[in-house]
Structures are given as C-alpha cells and as structure tokens.
Amino acid sequence: MGAAENNLEMEGTLEIGMEYRTVSGVAGPLVILEKVKGPKYQEIVNIRLGDGTTRRGQVLEVDGEKAVVQVFEGTSGIDNKYTTVQFTGEVLKTPVSLDMLGRIFNGSGKPIDNGPPILPEAYLDISGSSINPSERTYPEEMIQTGISTIDVMNSIARGQKIPLFSAAGLPHNEIAAQICRQAGLVKRLEKSDNLLEHQEDDNFAIVFAAMGVNMETAQFFKRDFEENGSMERVTLFLNLANDPTIERIITPRIALTTAEYLAYECGKHVLVILTDMSSYADALREVSAAREEVPGRRGYPGYMYTDLATIYERAGRIEGRKGSITQIPILTMPNDDITHPTPDLTGYITEGQIYIDRQLHNRQIYPPINVLPSLSRLMKSAIGEGMTRRDHSDVSNQLYANYAIGKDVQAMKAVVGEEALSSEDLLYLEFLDKFERKFVAQGAYDTRNIFQSLDLAWTLLRIFPRELLHRIPAKTLDQFYSRDTTN
C-alpha cells in the first residue's frame, strides 16, 4: 500500500479504501471492474499492477456494482489476474501555490523542470468551483498583446474567451509565444489621450497548457519563455504527443484550476493559453469510442459541446475579486475546415475568434491574421475614451470597411484588368497592399503599443480623402486626420 500512497501527490492525504481484484476487461484507455461496493462517479482510484507499479484512474461510469475507470497513464500491462484497484473516495485534486509561477509541469501537474517540489497552499478539485452567474462581472479593460491586428481590430477584454483558429503548418505556436512575451495589463486612463503604458507589473500571470504537442514544440516554448525572461510569470503544463492520450482530458482542467487560484485567491489577472484543443477533442473521441457510445458528427461524442463549455466557461471575472481569467484557446482546423466540429462548437461557446490565414502565410506575412473572419464580441467594452483612445472604435470600423472593399476591388481587377478601375478603386488597392505589408505584418519580436498601432492605422487611412472615410465622425476626423503621427 506504500507504493500507492506515494502515488497520491495530486490528491493530498486520502483515506485509502478497499482493494479489489475484480478487473473483468480492458478497452483502450478504460478498465472495467465488477463486484465493487459503492463506487462513485469521478472517484479517483489507485491501480497496482502485478509488477508493483502504480497508476491512477477516474471512475467514468457506474452501474450497480460495475464501474468503468479511465486510466491516466494508459492500460498497457493491466490484466485481470494480478491487478488490484483501490477506491479512494476522493475526486481528482491538484496542489496549487503561488510558487507554481516560473515552473514547468507535465500534463498531470507533476514538476518536470528538476526544481524543488511544490509546497501546496491548497488542494483544489480540477473541475473547478461553481460560480454563481449573477456574481459574474462583465469583462472590461483591455489586455494589450502588442500585435496590431488584435489590439486595434479584435481587442481582448480582461475576462474574455477568444480562440485562435489555425491549421497545420501555420505559425500559431509562434503567435502564442509572442502573446506570452508581450501581453500585459493596460492601465485605465484618466483623462490623458496620448499616454498609455504597457505595464509589466506583478499583477499579471500566464498559465500555458500544451496538449498533444511534439518534443520540438515543447522545447520551443520552454526555450522561448526562458530566453526572453517571461518565464517568471508563466506556469507551463506540457502533455507531449507520446504521453497518454487520456491525460489530455485533465491537462486543461489542471491548468484552469491553477489559474483560478492565482486569479481569485492571489488577485492576479491571468491569461490562459490552451493549445491544441483539437488534440483534446480527439482524446475525448477516443474515450467515447472505447465506451462504445453512439457517435455524433465525425465520430465525436454528442456531449462534446457541453464538455468544451466546462473548459471555456471558466474564464471571466467575479464580483468582489480582484483577479480575472482570460482564455485564448488555440485549435488547428483539420484540412483548414472551419465547419469541423471542434472549431464549430468552439465558436458557439466563445466570444469571437482570431483567424490565422494560410494565404497570408504563403505570402510571407507574419502574423498571418485575416481580420475579415476575425471577431471580438466584447471589444466594445474594452476600448474607447478612458480605456484606450476615443477614436479606437471608429478607426477599427473604417479599417474593416476599407479592407473589405479593397479585397472586392482586387477580385474585380482579376476579371476586368487594372485599366478598367477608377481612381477611387486604385486608392483601395493601394490601401490593401500597405495594410497587409505595414499593419498586419510585424516582426515576431516587434511590440507595438495601442497608440503606435492606432497612429499607424491613421497613416494608412490618410491614403483616402476625408470624404471617403464614411465611418469616422467629422469631430474625430478634425482631431486626428491631419495630426502629426509623431504625437
């Protein structure tokens, strides 16, 4: 029993229950037990193999004296003759502490950076605490990423959940690392209209969870965080591609439980980045298939919408608590298909999306963010006078309109030729080219604060005469149209 007790690092002190040697079958990551007295849903079990090694599992299904257990470390080597199972009577909990900042953990929450063990300040259920909906506070105030297309046109509010829709071969990992390097709190302005500080204060933290990534990607994130000095405010959870698939189901929940502790108990504003949610959905499908459930679209379980919501809805702010949790899940769309169940259901739950475009990437534009299908539904509450600048919303609307018209003119040019275009059409083509080369494109280590991005946007809008800027009020044009961009 000592070996099993040593394997309970995540649960703390538990009352070990009875041992059973009643394994009746193994199906994929699942173990079926019979003649079990009083098993409980989501109860943690300790599994000891014939060679003395121990593993952990969780009860997925209960039917009388029959229990189905998912094994986090995989079912290889489990037999029905020598394997014993202990029921702990506890749900899965993870140790949390402020000391987790600057540390690297595996997908189960165990340190893998050769550092000292974490001295937990609490053990929390990885499913999270239930939040009274009436106590939620509307997300306000902007998180500055330093990326112009996000900050100006898809501003992220503190407490928002907004995914990155990407695909295989696109630089979503580089964009995620850049956001981690550059993201910070934006100070609410009093009456100043020209001074905004990118704050690197102690109140901001990042929880990064990688699911199903290869070793190269894991090393990229570890090296990037350590080299640029942002590691001290990052907690990193890594579930590698060769780790058990079933572990991917608990990795985002452990990460979010850590984020909830940092936000609601330590008062920090936490940015949670989850990559890759497509790997999480595939793990969910694997468990569903092993349980022989009726499949939904493309083999994914019918409850995947509900399951994803239990992750995404843990973002937000709570009345009376200083901290907040902002989520940026990253998912890769198979075959660039935005109608795939994972991005489709994610889009229903989250508050917008940021779309990474393959055509822009093929033209060597980084970050290849296509602003037209991108959207931030809570942007209006995070910008404007007192938050960023009074012209922010109008500039964003005008950029969207002119870029959309420019794309239409570009398509028309391919049909009728440049000679058939009007002088006004040529202005939109000029704007289209400069917008993508100067505004969308920026270096991976190029940080632009919100004022630099807005002034750059005005430089592009000055391509047009005032009378063509229909979405900007005359009062705003009077103040900004002819202003020197050097402030």
Swiss-Prot record:
One of its GO terms (biological process) is ATP metabolic process. One of its GO terms (cellular component) is proton-transporting V-type ATPase, V1 domain. It is found in: Vacuole membrane. Keywords: Acetylation, Hydrogen ion transport, Ion transport, Membrane, Transport, Vacuole. The keyword Transport applies. It is a peripheral membrane protein. GO terms for molecular function: ATP binding; proton-transporting ATPase activity, rotational mechanism. It comes from the Eukaryota. The modification N-acetylglycine is found at residue 2. PROSITE patterns: ATPASE_ALPHA_BETA. Signal peptide: none annotated. Gene3D superfamilies: 3.40.50.12240. Non-catalytic subunit of the peripheral V1 complex of vacuolar ATPase. V-ATPase is responsible for acidifying a variety of intracellular compartments in eukaryotic cells. Belongs to the ATPase alpha/beta chains family. HAMAP family: ATP_synth_B_arch (MF_00310). V-ATPase is a heteromultimeric enzyme composed of a peripheral catalytic V1 complex (components A to H) attached to an integral membrane V0 proton pore complex (components: a, c, c'', d and e). This is V-type proton ATPase subunit B2. The gene is VHA-B2.
